[in-house]
Amino acid sequence: ATYKVKFITPEGEQEVECDDDVYVLDAAEEAGIDLPYSCRAGSCSSCAGKVVSGFVDQSDESFLDDDQIAEGFVLTCAAYPTSDVTIETHKEEELV
């Protein structure tokens, strides 16, 4: 399946199409959207975002705790879309 992923960045909103087997960070990069990242392995917080609506599968990540996930935080480098989804990017500072 292919879903619409909308990124709300400091520069504005941008939307990409993302297959359900592609990480949302990779889909953003392919579309020329510059998002923060570091490890690309789901084990740090550089790429953290927050899901505003919709759902992702981020079972590959190993950094966020259950409370952070419940609040909507997402590691874009290790998240697959499971529906149309809207994600606020550049949220690493809010994870403290």
Curated annotation (Swiss-Prot):
GO biological process: electron transport chain
Classification via CDD domains: fer2
Binding site for [2Fe-2S] cluster: C39, C44, C47, C77
Domain 2Fe-2S ferredoxin-type span(s) in chain numbering: 3-93
Disulfide bonds, paired cysteine numbers: none
InterPro entries on file: 2Fe-2S_ferredoxin-like_sf, 2Fe-2S_ferredoxin-type, 2Fe2S_fd_BS, Beta-grasp_dom_sf, Fd_pln
Highest taxon, organism lineage: Eukaryota
Coiled-coil annotated spans: none
GO cellular component: chloroplast
Cofactor binding summary note: Binds 1 [2Fe-2S] cluster.
Assigned keywords, A-Z: 2Fe-2S, Chloroplast, Electron transport, Iron, Iron-sulfur, Metal-binding, Plastid, Transport
Pfam families registered for this protein in UniProt: Fer2
SUPFAM superfamilies to which the protein is assigned, alphabetical: 2Fe-2S ferredoxin-like (SSF54292)
Subcellular location: Plastid, Chloroplast
Primary location class: plastid
GO terms of molecular function: 2 iron, 2 sulfur cluster binding; electron transfer activity; metal ion binding
Cofactor entry: [2Fe-2S] cluster
Protein family: Belongs to the 2Fe2S plant-type ferredoxin family.
Function field: Ferredoxins are iron-sulfur proteins that transfer electrons in a wide variety of metabolic reactions.
NCBIfam families associated with the record: fdx_plant (TIGR02008)
Name of the protein: Ferredoxin
Species: Brassica napus
Lineage per the UniProt record: Eukaryota, Viridiplantae, Streptophyta, Embryophyta, Tracheophyta
